[in-house]
């Protein structure tokens, strides 16, 4: 699969009545910034990716990131680990990357093999270089960052603060860290592993939702279901849903497809961030942006003799 395939949305999407929230406007801003900053200081930013060859999708993800890194002016170093690697082995590799001053950003590509202790492995990455969960050493989940940037670009951030946000699924992008940050940033967030068309907001455990349940609100659905391409049909989405953000990813013979059925793109009441072309390209470009910003932090700490890189 060519990396560009994830960045562009199919022409078929444009024929529907739904409003498309495409990532290209946000990507354009980040790309321009990367071109200005990548070589500043005479040092090329380096992003290191640890991955496990769990299948064709894993290799596709590596290639897609390589394509974006080349466009951003970021060197891209890939470290393949055995699928049966132990937590200790992966931590040993992370330690080497933490200590290497040539490496500025570190990403461990999901999904991780089942035998690994994911929180321990992910938590071992130096925060300075952890481009998925930190920005300038502050906790800032990359997917939540991409979500906010997309809504801001389309003037929807303020309405999102008043909407019910239903996060459905779990996996490579919807993680515990993503859900935690979304609940910190937005008052009416609920998360579940599956998609329930009969979802009743009055049954929500989220305190803010319980207090406001009688107030009519628009709803936003964010999905990463791993139930197959086009799993969410139009009949499953209630009228009060105003925004759908598709984080599903399926590489098929027809190209990349997300969780949303094409029938949803015919609903004029919806704003949709599709796969491909919606949130996912923004995620990729934020990885590059954070790597470039981390370059300056790493250089500064090396100059000052800081020992926090020696984890």
What are these regions (language model features)?
Residues 73-142, 264-267:
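Phosphate/diphosphate ligand-binding glycine-rich loop within oxidoreductases
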Residues 2-42, 138-153:
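Short N-terminal or domain-adjacent regulatory/targeting segments
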Residues 15, 20, 24-36, 41-47, ...:
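Adenosine-phosphate binding glycine-rich loop
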Residues 51, 107-111, 168:
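Short beta-strand segments
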